[in-house]
């Protein structure tokens, strides 16, 4: 799941690998075992990786909301503070009741309460008393994308007199965040009617229609409690007393706008092409009556007709009768599973009449709504360990140093070997034990923790502008490595706090505890001074308190020494300490804003300086000619194209005439190209050396690239094993037809088999061939390869549907696998793409790149109950994408090589990979699967859910602090009905293609997790973008390195 700019709220829910599921027993049997476990590493890991980040995401959304309230209040008071409104020569006080019309030509402001004041932001350029300017063509079309739901096309011009264009964006952003919190279904409509009042033309006059008071009161009632979470009430500039209701005047047909007054609620979604859900969400009209819960409340399916041979769910969905009373929730509300006749020998009857398979009883999952399937269950049946007092706990809680059984029996008879410290671990001051590389397989000298206090260079980008450059670990938060610190909650929290400007030296303080200064002489930490900690806490703790969080316990200031202490040195900032981290942009005013907000089209600095000098050259960046995209110079000529026309990878080298250019732009002699040995450092001189050439007769001739020239392969001495090698090398499966075709050309280019090719032990075909020898048969090889079958589900019973998702039938997703490590168990989902190859996301291996600690489990549906179809393979190789960056969670993909081939069965078989040019269209429906969280727990059974593909442009609107790139796919629902949760990281997003084959298009990467309704859709790594890289890496590992 990288830590340069601070992480967006939505990213914090997608941690680097999911935690081991905290096993669930019967509620009565479990007692308080789990609640007592908060101090243990297992549950603490669950809290840090799941609950806290999700809460933090919600919290930071509220912090952002708070900042927008403050911004709007500032704009309001700046414009209204001391400037009385003059109407007909009289000075008005505060709180005038508006008639809810804004006239360009004349005023219609009521003077019933002359002591009231009209907020300046609700007036247009002409003051109400100014009748000197008539404008009969003041209406203009509404083009703002956030307000397309408005049922009218025209608004007034000029718009709000005191709200500049950038402030208008902030004004609407305030309502956008309220909308995401779902406090009132029409809150966005309310904001848009304020920003763009409907333009009504009445003869020579034009006036605007403001919201009705009842509309305002409904919005206030729904959202004031949300604002209360950040210690704000309904803003004064939105007070409802200034608006009028329709019934208060009869001489004007329409004096205010209300959603109830429109003829047909569909108009609220605009222009008739959209559908208004009962929840207030607008969806494209084409999604109505398509069998999917796009509205979150099934209102888009409520009035749809089913044919006579289909079952009509209470949700409105139509089902094949074969899916009724089969134990699976196909309707989404269990209406297809009620009042069923259960087989008493094979099925359990739930209280609502649903029948579930007997093997689901006492398996640790509550499959019945009334939980009757988990009553009177033994610990063993649920995969748990029984305490002496009958309490059930997970097996990993045994002998871990914490008493989880109330009688303490889980810590009895524990030998030294059973403790968390294993042979070879180092015992350290701040952590019970550390392995020699801090959990990392990249065991370079800087990572070595053999003496647990060795100084190492600072590599955490967040803190690379400190006045010192060496640190040692573990740090004051207990992080064992800088990589672990980079993916921690604290490395996201402090940069977000810095933006609030709560304390000038907060960033310096946070870095002194994230990357403590290391004394090069003693190897010991030099801590921050107590005063620095106390000042940071005093000024910034209140900001956390606003959203219900506490100052991190690990930063207890009493542990740090006083300044000028006689017996210990400590750190205090001097006047030259940089206030903003490298992950921030420093405004001219000194304010720090996230670097990702620099030049994003929206002013975040109070002096707007983050939107100045935004040209690529002005920011010392390289500009793509085609789309003016700005790139860092470090990605130019790095072998990975970033510009749409690949211009960043052109003209990167100047090879001689007898040389060819490698993919990384190095130069290698032509004679060395495709000679069986890698001469380019990236092995690109050995890529695509064997191909098939199709002529007009559709015969596939085997071609070999040698010294920049194509050659035919002579048939002399050819054997079937060579056809197998050729097809495998090209990634085309097994050979089905091999032919020897007579050559018609007079002087063909031949490559012939080496005389003793069988003893060469070559791994590629082209290294077994030689040039310069005659072909006696004058015949060339024609080859037809049969691709390995993929994407089939022979064991699946069709038609089924993770947060809002459903339990999946065994064998339905035979490519789904579980990436596991000891002792944690399931960490991430993964996908089988070939007999020996698996895909997952790169962030699952953050700090855990050692292949020896991983295994892959396939053919399993219930994590807690081994299956007869289950296959387990150890991991041989882990290949992370070299451009993977946690700072933006981009290039989030990795390839895993298994220790041996899988045995292909109906329950274990690979999925198909897409073609590089095969991209998903918006509003396509696909499936996600995994063992992610369903509400408040991680299920044992594999879950599945349908999701709709969302355009990248629409997706970007949900993520202000992240950039959605072409390496990503967005999927989910505006309502957040179904989306992948934490444990699904690395799991598949698959779509069914014609012929019943399933193709892998995405890997669950980041985005919305537990609060998808708040944070928008899920974000997936775009497999289509990476197909060439995937195939290249498999080829290199198979033929060039092995």
Swiss-Prot record:
It comes from Homo sapiens. The gene is CORIN. Glycans are attached at residues 80, 104, 135, 141, 231, 245, 251, 305, 320, 376, 413, 446, 451, 469, 567, 651, 697, 761, 1022. The keyword Transferase does not apply. The chain crosses the membrane at residues 46-66. The lineage of its organism: Eukaryota, Metazoa, Chordata, Craniata, Vertebrata. Its EC number is 3.4.21.-. The record marks 164-165, 427-428, 801-802 as: Cleavage. One of its GO terms (biological process) is regulation of renal sodium excretion. It comes from the Eukaryota. Residues 134-259, 450-573 form the FZ domain. It is linked to Pre-eclampsia/eclampsia 5: A hypertensive disorder of pregnancy characterized by new hypertension (blood pressure 140/90 or greater) presenting after 20 weeks' gestation with clinically relevant proteinuria. It impacts 2 individuals, the mother and her child, both of whom can be severely affected. Preeclampsia is one of the causes of maternal mortality and morbidity worldwide. Cardiomyopathy, familial hypertrophic, 30, atrial: An autosomal recessive heart disease characterized by enlarged and thickened left atrium, left atrial fibrosis, atrial arrhythmias, and hypertension. Inhibited in a dose-dependent manner by non-specific trypsin-like serine protease inhibitors including benzamidine. It is found in: Cell membrane. GO terms for cellular component: actin cytoskeleton; cell surface; extracellular region; nuclear body; plasma membrane. Disulfide bonds join 139-199, 147-192, 183-223, 212-256, 216-240, 269-282, 277-295, 289-304, 306-318, 313-331, 325-340, 342-355, 350-368, 362-377, 379-392, 387-405, 399-414, 455-518, 463-511, 502-540, 529-570, 533-557, 580-592, 587-605, 599-614, 616-630, 624-643, 637-652, 655-667, 662-680, 674-689, 790-912, 828-844, 926-991, 955-970, 981-1010. This is Atrial natriuretic peptide-converting enzyme. Belongs to the peptidase S1 family. Residues 1-45 are cytoplasmic.
């Amino acid at each position: 799941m990288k830590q340069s700019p601070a992480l967006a709220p939505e990213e914090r829910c997608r941690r680097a690998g999911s935690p081991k599921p905290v096993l669930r027993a019967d509620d009565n049997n479990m007692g308080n075992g789990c609640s007592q476990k908060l101090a243990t590493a297992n549950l603490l890991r669950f809290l840090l990786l799941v609950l806290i980040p999700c809460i933090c995401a919600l919290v930071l959304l509220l912090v952002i909301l708070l900042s927008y309230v403050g911004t709007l209040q500032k704009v309001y008071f700046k414009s209204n503070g001391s400037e009385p409104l003059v109407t007909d020569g009289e000075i008005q006080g505060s709180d005038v009741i508006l008639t809810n019309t804004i006239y360009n030509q004349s005023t219609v402001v009521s003077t019933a309460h002359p002591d009231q004041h009209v907020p300046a932001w609700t007036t247009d350029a002409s003051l109400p008393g100014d009748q000197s300017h008539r404008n009969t063509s003041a209406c203009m079309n509404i083009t703002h994308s956030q307000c397309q739901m408005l049922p009218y096309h025209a608004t007034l011009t000029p718009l709000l007199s005191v709200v500049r264009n950038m402030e208008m964006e902030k004004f609407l952003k305030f309502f956008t965040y309220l909308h995401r919190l779902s406090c009132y279904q029409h809150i966005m409509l309310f904001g848009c009617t304020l920003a763009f009042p409907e333009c009504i033309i009445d003869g020579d006059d034009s006036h605007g229609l403001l919201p009705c008071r009842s509309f305002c009161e409904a919005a206030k009632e729904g959202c004031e409690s949300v604002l209360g979470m950040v210690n704000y009430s309904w803003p004064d500039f939105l007070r409802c007393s200034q608006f009028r209701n329709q019934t208060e005047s009869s001489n004007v047909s329409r004096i205010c706008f209300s959603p109830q007054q429109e003829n047909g609620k569909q108009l609220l979604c605009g222009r008739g092409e959209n559908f208004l859900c009962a929840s207030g969400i607008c969806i494209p009209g084409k999604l109505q009556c398509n069998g999917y819960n796009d509205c979150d409340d099934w209102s888009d399916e409520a009035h749809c007709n089913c044919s006579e041979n289909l079952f009509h769910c209470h949700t409105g969905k139509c089902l094949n009768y074969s899916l009724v009373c089969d134990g699976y929730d196909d309707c989404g509300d269990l209406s297809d599973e009620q009042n069923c006749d259960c087989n008493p020998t094979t099925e359990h009857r739930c209280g609502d009449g649903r029948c579930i398979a007997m093997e689901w009883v006492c398996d640790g999952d509550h499959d019945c709504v009334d939980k009757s399937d988990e009553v009177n269950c033994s610990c063993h049946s649920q995969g748990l360990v029984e305490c002496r007092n009958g309490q059930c706990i997970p097996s990993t809680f045994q002998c871990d140093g914490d008493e989880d059984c109330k009688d303490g029996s889980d810590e009895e008879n524990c030998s030294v070997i059973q403790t968390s410290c294993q042979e070879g671990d180092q015992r350290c001051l701040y952590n019970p034990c550390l392995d020699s590389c801090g959990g990392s397989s990249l065991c370079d000298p800087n990572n070595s923790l053999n003496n647990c206090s060795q100084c190492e260079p600072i590599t955490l980008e967040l803190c690379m502008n400190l006045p010192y450059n060496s640190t040692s670990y573990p740090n004051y938060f207990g992080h064992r490595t800088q990589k672990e610190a980079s993916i921690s909650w604290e490395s996201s929290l402090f940069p977000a706090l810095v933006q609030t400007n709560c304390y000038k030296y907060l960033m310096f303080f946070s870095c002194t505890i994230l990357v403590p200064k290391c004394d090069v002489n003693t190897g010991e930490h030099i801590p921050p001074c107590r005063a620095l900690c106390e000042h940071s806490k005093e000024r910034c703790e209140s900001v956390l308190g606003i959203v219900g969080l506490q100052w991190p316990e690990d930063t207890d200031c009493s542990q740090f020494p006083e300044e000028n202490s006689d017996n210990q040195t400590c750190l205090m900032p001097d006047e030259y300490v940089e206030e903003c981290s490298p992950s921030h942009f420093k405004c001219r005013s000194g304010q720090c804003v996230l670097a990702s907000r620099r030049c994003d089209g929206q002013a975040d600095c109070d002096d707007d300086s983050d939107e100045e000098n935004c040209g690529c050259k002005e920011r010392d960046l390289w500009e793509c000619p085609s789309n003016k995209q700005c790139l860092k110079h470090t990605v130019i000529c790095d072998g990975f194209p970033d510009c749409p026309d690949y211009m960043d990878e052109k003209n990167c080298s100047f090879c001689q005439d007898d040389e060819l250019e490698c993919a990384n732009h190095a130069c290698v002699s032509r004679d060395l190209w495709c000679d069986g040995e890698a001469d380019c450092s990236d092995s690109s001189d050995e890529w695509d050396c064997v191909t098939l050439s199709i002529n007009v007769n559709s015969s596939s001739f085997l071609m070999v690239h040698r010294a920049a020239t194509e050659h035919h392969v002579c048939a002399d001495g050819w054997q079937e094993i060579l056809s197998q090698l050729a097809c495998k090398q090209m990634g085309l499966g097994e050979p089905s037809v091999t032919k020897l075709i007579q050559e018609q050309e007079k002087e063909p280019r031949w490559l012939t088999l080496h005389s003793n090719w069988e003893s060469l032990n070559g791994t590629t075909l082209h290294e077994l061939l030689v040039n310069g020898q005659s072909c006696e048969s004058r015949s060339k090889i024609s080859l037809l390869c049969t691709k390995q079958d993929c994407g089939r589900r022979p064991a699946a019973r069709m038609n089924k549907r993770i947060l809002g998702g459903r339990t999946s039938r065994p064998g339905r997703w035979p490519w789904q696998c579980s990436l596991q490590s000891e002792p944690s168990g399931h960490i991430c989902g993964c996908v089988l793409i070939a007999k020996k190859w698996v895909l997952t996301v790169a962030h699952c291996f953050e700090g855990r790149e050692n292949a020896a600690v991983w295994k892959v489990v396939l053919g399993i549906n219930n994590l807690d109950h081994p299956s007869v179809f289950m296959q387990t393979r150890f991991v041989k190789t882990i290949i992370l994408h070299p451009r993977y960056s946690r700072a933006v969670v981009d290039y989030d993909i990795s390839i895993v090589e298994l220790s041996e081939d899988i045995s292909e069965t109906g329950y274990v078989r690979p999925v198909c990979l897409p073609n590089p040019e095969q991209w998903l269209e918006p509003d396509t429906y696909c499936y996600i699967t995994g063992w992610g969280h369903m509400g408040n727990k991680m299920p044992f059974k594999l879950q599945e859910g349908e999701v709709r593909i969302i355009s990248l442009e629409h997706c970007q609107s949900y993520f202000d602090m992240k950039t959605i790139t072409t390496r990503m796919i967005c999927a989910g629902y505006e309502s957040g009905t179904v989306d992948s949760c934490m444990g699904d990281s690395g799991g598949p997003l698959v779509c069914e293609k014609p012929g019943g084959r399933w193709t892998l298009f995405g890997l669950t990467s980041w985005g919305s997790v537990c609060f998808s309704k708040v944070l928008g859709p899920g974000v997936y790594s775009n497999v289509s973008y990476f197909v060439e890289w995937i195939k290249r890496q498999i080829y290199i590992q198979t033929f060039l390195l092995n």
